[in-house]
Amino acid sequence: MLLFGESRPGAGGQEEVRAQLKERVIMSPLAAKRLAILLERGIRDYESKYGALESEAVRTNKESSEPAAMQEPPGHAIEELQEKAEALFQLIKTLGLEVGYERSFKISDKSLLANRFLLGFSKKSIQRKAREKIIDICVRMGMPDPFLEDFSEKLSEANYVHFGFEEDEGTSVYKAYLEFYDKIEKEIRSRPGKSESFLLHLGYKWDPSNHRKRALTKYTWHPSLSFEQIRKRTAHILDPRKYGPPFEIAGGILDLASQKIPHQDVLYLEVTEGNNPRRSFDINMYRANLQLKELYRLLSKLCEHYSIPLDEFRNLYDRVETKTFGHVSGGISRKGADFLTIYYGVEGYRITTD
């Protein structure tokens, strides 16, 4: 059922907001599910460029509503980034597109890795020769041949593409993701009334200095789970009997989000890779519009558990505390170690070569 109405200020100038309902539309379950997918896609399209709907709008020039050209990622002097990270930015600049720029930091035992980012865009935003330009970036990134063949084959089914970089302990990783919202919508139309999971992303990840170190990652979306169902599924991945602190901290973040948004606004994914122990979850809560500073207590406990010096954490936290929290990923790494990763601050930028 859809309800339409107007919001009005509460009586006496208080912060209370009242809703006056005017109309309602009753839909079949299939129509409602299709509408939910379309709304989800539209909102994610917007948020991939501008951030959460209720957060501050993308930075603009005073004279224009267009996003300012980004010559380097804010908060990171380009000379401080490693050569491979800078090379990826230069490749994306050749597209001349507005992209979503998202950062993250990964915490595990005695390790805090913060040199991580994703650059994402809609395939349709490339007006000419989109396929050729995207494949060219993959080639110039040095994507391994087996990945390049598979990526090229599946690119036609994707509607979003993301490229990323992360600094790992003693090495670095390039990443390329395909996102399949359009394909999911078609699957739902072809199989009405069925509740199931969907492959939302494929992630191609490799060490640019050693192509033997590579992994194909599958991100499976489980729609419309309740908060309790999400907690139960995360417990199967990050067993609280063995990994109590990170499990409880991820749950604490979910609790904070649950106070601001319904469970339908949470995007829950499970992550797997073939031939290694990697298994994790990803809980996207951008719509809760939480700032990282609201997670400080939980993040401090996480650093204490993983033996991260407080000054090392504060050096990162003090620069990003007002950024919008996005999603938390947690589970078991390829090496069999537990971890949590915090994603934050997706913003829209126009990256140009000018």
What residue ranges belong to the model's regions?
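Positively charged, low-complexity terminal tracts
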Residues: 1-65
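Structured alpha/beta or helical-core interaction and ligand-binding surfaces enriched in interleaved
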Residues: 66-354
